[in-house]
Amino acid sequence: MDVLVGQKIESLLEGNISKDKNIRIINGNVLTGHKCSLDDYLDAHASEVTVIPEGDDVNELFGWIMPRFNQYSVNRSYFSWLTRGKEYTLDSRIKGGKRHMIMSGEYDKVLPMNIFGEYLIKAIIVGDIDKMEALGIYEVSPEDFALPEFVDSSKLELQSIVRNGLDMLRKENA
């Protein structure tokens, strides 16, 4: 589909979405895009518009205690790993609140470069510029942490943390 930069989102999705379900419209992709509405316009650098279920219509009895054969899990928290090759319908729910940062090495499995991602995030959070530089802050962008943000069991907003760290570095070096 050919579209113009700045085209209204509603005109792009007209006839392709159901009005009776709660959906989340994302200007961009699921990992790095941002939430928008039908009244917003296509961003200049966006190459796609993504629509996913909001997930607010799901009530799960006993939540985390159930075996969840139909839920996707990166680290085998649910029994869904027994059914290989299955396609899952993901929604926008976080499924739990924020937790303390857990040093489990899960970022290292999905980061596109060979750095200590968890230590870099910790250095950014505390504002230790020397440690940030030693751990490779100049080599990363917020988008590099999109997949680690998806798999993060601590549910931290890693892309925002990295953006704040880069902004802090720019102010310090200016």
Predicted features along the sequence, with ranges:
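Redox cofactor-anchoring modules in respiratory/redox and cofactor-processing assemblies
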Residues: M1-A174
